[in-house]
A protein has these predicted regions:
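Juxtamembrane regions of bacterial inner-membrane/periplasmic proteins
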Residues: 1-234
């Protein structure tokens, strides 16, 4: 029995050492990926590239309910975390470990913006770590509203629409500032899975996603249940 216990202790120790070594390696690789990316093209340069586009929309030209919907469904702790939502990442990490792959990202708005600016959509641990380093830098240089503004101007909405203005014009035939509450909450749900929720492909799925958006808005006190129901029955 004592021999068995010793063997178990040794195996546990080996696993811990191997785990620490693997984590250290991934962190080092992720940091290198982040440094290489920003040295090649600084964040400020990337940001100005987006802001200079003809279809760029400023945050004060967007309906407040649209912004609230985005935050509710994508990153409800956006205004309180430092660029990375540790709780969301921890929950996602547990699910990833169970599945033995990156099945759940846990990325918030800032991390998604970093991915859109620099990285591919391919799910890799090193890329996720690079996003974390870049998110901290982005949050040091820009306000939350500036980050949210950049986010909605760089995310994909399906049907070849890569910003909120193109999506609003393409799906509804109007500028973002003219979207009503129904359109705003409908559009907010699409970027989670644009190929699935694109209104030109799967309108029924998009409306199911909209219900999820409204549920989140009620949960995080952006809307009352009565207001959410009124929007759905618009």
């Amino acid at each position: 029995m004592r021999t068995l216990r010793k063997i178990i202790k040794v195996l546990v120790l080996i696993c811990l050492i191997a785990g620490i070594a693997a984590c250290s390696y991934l962190i080092h690789e992720g940091y290198d990926m982040y440094k290489t990316a920003v040295e090649k093209e600084p964040i400020a340069q990337k940001v100005e590239e987006i802001r200079s586009r003809d279809n760029y929309t400023k945050i004060d030209e967007l309906p407040q309910i649209y912004l609230d919907a985005i935050v509710s469904v994508e990153d409800h702790r956006f205004y309180s975390h430092p660029g990375v939502d540790i709780l969301a990442i921890g929950r996602a990490a547990i699910n990833d470990i169970k599945a033995m792959s990156l099945v759940e990202g846990g990325s918030g708005i800032t991390q998604q913006l970093c991915k859109n600016l620099y990285f591919t959509q391919e799910k890799k641990f090193t890329r996720k770590i690079a996003e974390v380093f870049m998110s901290f830098e982005l949050e040091k240089k820009y306000t939350k509203d500036e980050i949210l503004e950049l986010y909605v101007n760089s995310i994909y909405f399906g049907n070849n629409y890569y910003c909120v203005k193109d999506a609003s014009l393409g799906y509804f035939g109007k500028l973002p500032k003219d979207m009503n509450d129904y359109e705003s909450t409908l559009l907010a749900g699409i970027p989670n899975a644009p190929s699935a929720y694109a209104l030109t492909k799967n309108p029924d799925l998009a409306h199911q996603r909209q219900k999820r958006v409204l549920e989140k808005m009620v949960k995080y006190n952006y809307l009352t249940q009565k207001e959410a129901e009124a929007i759905m029955h618009n």
